[in-house]
């Protein structure tokens, strides 16, 4: 499984990294992503690689194509593009989908479980990026005001990304727990 956030990719292996880069290029084209001129930096692009063609969750999403389209959620191939709308909107989307899932196919939920594991690696990548940025921009203690302001803005933006991912993770976690209790 791979996740692309604001054009930055996070994947479990080299093959997935290559695949997400190739498909992300398709997503960014106007023809492939017709409902928006470009993917916003705060959009979350989830690629469920290796999932079964008839995965109940993905099939349910297809049935609610119009509902998703109104919220600018795009389901294209193995991609689910979720513009950040807030936890409640994501929960509403899940509520519309959950009754269409075949609970007998719990193995398919393994792909959902993978969705809630990426935030840890994302956080690590952010920390490493800031370490490199500080080391490159500020080799000594003399920090210019405008550069410090730029760093603060970048920190705030990255922190916003992390909060968005954590909220989505929370919603999905409650959703999975709900499904498991129904069995």
Curated annotation (Swiss-Prot):
Induction: Expressed in the late phase of the viral replicative cycle. Keywords: Late protein. Belongs to the asfivirus S183L family. This is Uncharacterized protein S183L.
